[in-house]
Design a protein with these regions (language model features):
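Conserved beta-strand hairpin/beta-sheet module of binuclear metal-dependent hydrolase folds
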Residues: 1-75, 159-189, 207
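Metallo-beta-lactamase
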Residues: 16, 113-182
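Short beta->alpha connector loops
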Residues: 37-40, 63-65, 90-93, 152-155, ...
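Active-site metal-binding motif and surrounding structural segment of the metallo-beta-lactamase
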Residues: 55, 64-111, 206
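Active-site neighborhood of phospho(di)ester-bond hydrolases with catalytic His/Asp-centered motifs
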Residues: 57-62, 83-91, 109-113, 186-189, ...
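Metal-dependent catalytic neighborhoods of phosphoester/phosphodiester hydrolases
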Residues: 95-105, 121-122, 268-274
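Short, surface-exposed amphipathic charged segments that create phosphate/polyanion-binding patches used
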Residues: 144-151, 295-306
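Cap/insert and terminal regions of metallo-dependent hydrolase folds
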Residues: 195-291
Length: 306
């Protein structure tokens, strides 16, 4: 499910943003789309178009390869265009071992260094693709970087990413009215808590994808066992709707917010939509069952703040 792009006045723009990609853009652009998000599987895609080349980076591999490749094909993406897959952490809903055999030979699977022991123990080793470890910024392509921040989540932690695209342009207000160089996107899920370091890491991104996992009231009223409730709400599990909103308000994203990992049992799109009414950023709510629309990174800042 998604929410139409909203201007500050509440009017909706409805571009045909769910259609296949079609021809490569003549000008550099970055597109983002969530294929699925939730406890049954998480996978998103970044598409980077520059100098006549289209490249894709998958963020998490929590859907089966067959399902993911089918969705990508429907979106106009080929397997050979997948250059990178980057993992936030290694929970079963964020990585499927079937990808070890099916990532293209030229692709890189990026795993944080602190996750490597668990990756080895669970047999996460690509057959054809390169296994790339990191603990500092990743250069995906010239002018495309991912800056990591490790946050608390269960035992091994989770990586929050700030993606920076030097070749893309955004359209904020500049003195001469020209497009400003550079665009950025934050991706944060399974966090557990909001810290000043997190806010600083994500501050001012053009697009912010962040989890809004549960409503505390619904969580308390649910039939879930107490240990599970404590795991989720205890500071190293997931963000509540209010915690997510606090993080968004602190980070001040320029144009668009994409909400991730909504609990089907302890949350609802209607609850989170109401919490974000009147905001000056566009809002998209991801789903476990269908992809979101395409979100262009860096293209709508001026329109959303006009």
């Amino acid at each position: 499910m998604f929410v139409p792009w909203l201007s500050p006045t509440g009017s909706a723009e409805t571009p045909d943003a769910a259609a296949p990609l079609g021809a490569i853009s003549d000008t550099p652009r970055v597109l983002f789309r969530v294929l699925a998000s939730g406890s049954s599987g998480n996978c998103s895609v970044l598409v980077i178009e520059n100098e006549g080349v289209r490249r894709a980076c998958l963020i998490d591999l929590g859907l089966s390869p067959r399902h993911t490749l089918r969705l990508l094909g429907e979106m106009g993406l080929r397997p050979d265009q997948i250059d990178d897959a980057i993992l936030t952490h290694l929970d079963h809903d964020h990585v499927k071992l079937g990808w070890c055999k099916l990532l293209p030979a030229h692709a890189r699977l990026h795993v944080h260094r602190r996750h490597v022991p668990r990756a080895r123990s669970m047999g996460l080793r690509p057959v054809h693709a390169r296994f790339a470890t990191f603990d500092d910024r990743i250069t995906l392509h010239p002018g495309v970087e991912a800056r990591p921040l490790v946050m608390s989540h269960d035992e091994d932690g989770v990586v929050v990413f700030r993606f920076e695209f030097a070749h893309a342009t955004r359209t904020p207000e500049t003195p001469d009215g020209a497009a400003a160089p550079g665009a950025s996107m934050g991706f944060a899920t399974d966090l557990g808590c909001v810290t000043g370091e997190l806010i600083e890491h994500l501050y001012g991104v053009d697009v912010l994808a962040i989890e809004s996992n549960y409503c505390p009231r619904l969580q308390a009223e649910s039939a879930r066992p107490e240990y599970l409730k404590q795991r989720i709400m205890g500071g190293s599990g997931h963000l509540s709707n209010q915690q997510s909103l606090d993080a968004i308000l602190g980070a001040e994203p320029r144009e668009h917010v994409v909400l991730l990992h909504l609990s089907r049992e302890c949350n609802s799109p209607a609850i989170v939509r109401e919490m974000h009414e009147g905001s000056d950023y566009a809002l998209t709510i991801s789903s476990q069952f269908e992809p979101t629309r395409w979100v262009q990174v860096g293209a709508h800042a001026a329109a959303s703040r006009a």
